[in-house]
């Protein structure tokens, strides 16, 4: 009998997801909401992957320096302990404070560099960039032209994807499209990530579970 899958979501309810070899810690939960003046208040999520190496995914706005230092310090880390910094895309609420990590390998969208040396890697061909066993960066464009996400295997929740603004938040259906440079492409990669992930960490909201239910097709 053929089956069809149905997906629902559920808040994780925690900023810490333990794992082996890597645990995932949201050290700042992103947000975005309109203010009284018709503008938008927003800042991106900042996520630490801690295992054999320390990996920081997105670095917030320029004024998030204190948040980053405090978040790292809470895990016994200093900026010089961070081996990789991944910025999922180039918007200002995701790339602030890169100057804190001059020793790290930095990935911003499809660029991979160590100081002034740009490493050859073809994200456009669909090749993931392996940081370590169980941790890789892969292309998820649509919100911008060259977004990336980070996949972490082996956590207590299963596979976690730190997705940047591929997902604004858990309940973003109908609101992400006006922010997208290519909604059709973004929708494709949203579906792909939902099929891969047990938990998604969005760019502007709390982590949420992706629950795949299979039921007989009529």
Give the positions of each predicted feature.
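Metallo-beta-lactamase
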Residues: 7-11, 70, 100, 104-144, 146-218, ...
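Zn-dependent metallo-beta-lactamase
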Residues: 1-52, 188-199, 209-218
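Core dinuclear metal-dependent hydrolase active-site scaffold
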Residues: 26, 47-50, 126-155
């Amino acid at each position: 009998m053929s089956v069809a899958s149905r997906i629902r979501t559920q808040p994780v309810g925690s900023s810490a997801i333990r794992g082996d070899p890597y645990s995932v810690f949201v050290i700042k939960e992103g947000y975005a909401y309109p203010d009284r003046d018709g503008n938008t208040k927003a800042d991106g999520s900042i996520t630490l992957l801690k295992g054999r190496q320390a990996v920081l995914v997105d670095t917030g706005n320029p004024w998030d320096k204190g948040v980053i230092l405090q978040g790292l310090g809470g895990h016994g880390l200093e900026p010089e302990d961070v081996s990789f910094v991944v910025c999922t895309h180039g918007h200002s609420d995701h790339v602030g404070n890169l100057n804190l990590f001059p020793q790290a390998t930095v990935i911003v969208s499809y660029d991979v560099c160590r100081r002034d040396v740009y490493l050859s890697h073809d994200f456009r061909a669909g090749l993931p960039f392996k940081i370590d066993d169980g941790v890789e960066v892969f292309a998820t464009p649509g919100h911008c032209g060259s977004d990336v996400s980070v996949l972490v295997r082996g956590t207590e929740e299963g596979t976690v994807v730190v997705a940047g603004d591929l997902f604004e938040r858990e309940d973003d259906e109908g609101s992400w499209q006006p922010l997208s440079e290519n909604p059709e492409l973004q929708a494709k990669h949203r579906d792909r990530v939902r099929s891969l992930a047990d938990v998604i960490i969005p760019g502007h909201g709390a982590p949420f579970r992706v629950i795949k239910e299979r039921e007989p097709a009529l």
